[in-house]
Regions:
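ABC ATPase NBD coupling module
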Residues: 118-133, 277
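Q-loop/switch helix immediately C-terminal to the Walker
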Residues: 138, 144-163
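The feature captures the beta-strand-to-loop junction immediately N-terminal to the Walker
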Residues: 87-89
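Conserved structural motif at the start of ABC-family nucleotide-binding domains
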Residues: 55-57, 70-73
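Conserved ABC transporter NBD signature motif
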Residues: 110-117, 163
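Helix-to-loop junction immediately C-terminal to a conserved catalytic motif
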Residues: 102
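Walker B catalytic motif
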Residues: 209-213, 220
Length: 298
């Protein structure tokens, strides 16, 4: 009946090791019991449910003006509504990847597709209008602007100042203490980092990119940050891309991508890949945060 058949009940069959094919079978009621009548059963194909790729990178490459290759043909995707963590050794190309997706750099080869559209040639402002937000690894200090100015700009003209500043509490900052403060040298790196994350929250974008969000913040703030990402993940209709090698961030990922020497070394679900990175004993230990030495061996 769900597919328009007046007499039947739909049953979905999924082949596990071949291409997914679904069939709807008409089940006929006979003698008060539901049985399958071979001569009366109707079999017809039903459309396959497909994973929607919000972000897709195709053969992405980037090199410095001097000719040094940083990224060498990266292929990966971020599904809609998922949280993907990119990890790997220092200097492997993680931050470069984030900058290319955000529009801060232009790839020397390959394509970037966002929500089905080729955005390779768009700059960071144009991509922001498409729904991409980027939180820098090193936060930017905006002279002459107050915290509430930044949050209001991020949230847009249809959002009140009070509503925009409510996002400060989400990242563990008291709005009353910070709302009128100027974004200058009086703010620590950790405070700036949290303000920048609050700006991303205020925007409510389709794709949120965070480059090592744990850098420069204390343990309490980091624990609060994990709760922020978990809440974003539960509420977002888009997706989240995080650059990190902290175990507690990897532990909330749907997918982990390991970038090494400018290429995708491994990719997989958290359940499949995290034990391989940590070793089964370390994977159960939430106090073990630094993965760099493990990742180097991937």
């Amino acid at each position: 009946r769900k597919w328009g058949h007046p007499d039947g009940v739909a049953i979905l069959l999924n082949t596990k090791y071949t291409k997914k094919v679904y069939f709807a079978l008409r089940v006929c009621a006979q003698g008060g019991k539901e049985t399958l009548s071979a001569e009366k059963a109707c079999i017809w194909p039903v459309a396959e449910e497909r994973e929607i790729k919000m972000l897709q990178l195709e053969h992405l490459a980037w090199q410095l003006p001097g000719g040094e290759s940083i990224l060498k043909g990266v292929d990966m995707h971020v599904p809609k509504g998922k949280l993907v963590v990119v990890t790997g050794p220092n200097g492997g190309g993680k931050t470069s990847l984030a900058k290319l997706v955000a529009g801060l750099e232009t790839p020397t080869a390959g394509r970037i597709l966002f929500d089905g559209e080729d955005i390779t040639g768009l700059d960071i402002t144009q991509r922001a209008r498409k729904g991409i937000a980027y939180a820098f690894q090193q936060p930017v200090r905006f002279k002459g602007l107050r915290v509430k100015d930044l949050l209001s700009l991020a949230a847009g003209k249809n959002t009140s100042v009070n509503e925009a500043c409510s996002y400060l509490s989400e990242v563990g900052l008291c709005a009353r203490d910070y709302i009128d403060r100027e974004v200058n040298a009086s703010l620590s790196g950790g405070e700036l980092k949290r303000i920048e994350i609050a700006m991303v929250l205020a925007r409510g974008t389709k794709l949120s990119i965070f480059d090592e969000p744990e850098a420069g913040i204390d343990l309490w703030s980091f624990q609060n940050l994990i709760r922020v990402f978990e809440k974003m993940y539960e509420q977002t209709k888009g997706c989240i891309l995080i650059i990190s090698h902290q175990e507690r961030i990897l532990n909330i990922a749907d997918t982990i991508v390991v970038i090494k020497n400018g290429q995708v070394a491994r990719t997989g679900s958290r359940a499949d890949l995290l034990p391989a990175l940590l070793g089964s004993a370390d994977a159960a230990n939430p106090a073990c945060d630094v993965l760099t030495s493990k990742i180097e061996g991937v």
